[in-house]
């Protein structure tokens, strides 16, 4: 179960979020062909087997850092919380790649800021302004 399932997003949000809303495949039944995902799926819904892409991950992390910086302006955060999917951690990328992503975020948001990071399985964050449970993503909150 290395491949996330991608549910197609509406065109109105693809510029900010990409083409797919990713979900982890929790289990599969080889006899029936059924899979379990942590979301509601309508009977006729189409989803895609996707592949994780490090370059897209880098772009998303950079965009996230710049969004936070844009929201807080010239203010220095007092504390940053980072919730990183464990499926993106050592399972998918090497430790030096993870360190490079973190360094990029620190340089963008603030390198002298206390930073609390957590590996999670199911991150809660907005998608088109509505809080959603995500898989294979990074969610951050900056207190300033």
Provide a role label for each language-model segment.
Residues 1-108, 118-144:
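Small-residue-enriched flexible segments
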Residues 112-114:
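Proline-centered loop/turn at the N-terminus of a beta-strand
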């Amino acid at each position: 179960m290395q491949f996330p399932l991608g549910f197609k997003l509406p065109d109105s949000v693809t510029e900010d979020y990409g083409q797919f809303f990713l979900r982890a495949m929790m289990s599969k039944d080889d006899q029936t062909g059924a899979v379990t995902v942590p979301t509601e799926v309508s009977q006729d819904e189409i989803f895609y087997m996707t592949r994780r892409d490090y370059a897209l991950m880098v772009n998303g992390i950079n965009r996230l850092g710049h969004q936070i910086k844009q929201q807080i302006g010239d203010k220095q955060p007092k504390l940053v919380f980072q919730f990183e999917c464990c499926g993106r951690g050592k399972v998918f990328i090497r430790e030096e790649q993870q360190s490079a992503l973190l360094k990029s975020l620190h340089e963008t948001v603030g390198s002298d800021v206390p930073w609390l990071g957590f590996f999670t399985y199911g991150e809660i964050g907005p998608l088109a302004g509505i809080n959603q449970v995500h898989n294979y993503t990074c969610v951050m909150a900056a207190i300033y």
